[in-house]
Amino acid sequence: EMKQKVTASRLADILDHVNRIYQGGYYSTDIGTSENINIRFNLATHDERGNRLATPGVEYVKWDGTYPIDANDFMNNNKKGYARYLWEPNDYINVMVYPFAPEANSAEVTLGVSHLPFTLKGVNETDGLSALESKYNDISKKNLSFAYCSSINSDFIDYEVDRYTNASHN
């Protein structure tokens, strides 16, 4: 359905904001501005099999389940095979955009959920990241049983992106 799809131009705008943040001096908070960490993100032009994408950065996949989607189930269930929607996580950052099901008995709305990033426990462990035991040092598509990704609620993608890019709200 078209209302569930994010346009190529909107994705390019989102990634432009993200890249400006990572190039430094763009996003200012009470603890300082963003720093240039020499990373630039690009929308994939080809899928992991080498096929050209009609919309850069997007593979539209028909969902066989019910809408809206239970984000907790999608992100954490290792029995339903949702890892099949991933591209190799060592080559791509997997971001899934779909309408989230409301949480039972709650007026709260989840805007986004992420497993990223991880760090390995030990000497080089990075504060603020989810730490994994070193036996999990090979996070690859072939050994994942759950959807190792970030998910954004498509009903709120503009709000979520604007929140991280310091845009104002009315």
Please place each PLM-identified region on the residue numbering:
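Metzincin-family zinc-dependent endopeptidase catalytic domain
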Residues: 20-169
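Primarily auto-inhibitory N-terminal propeptides
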Residues: 1-17, 21-22
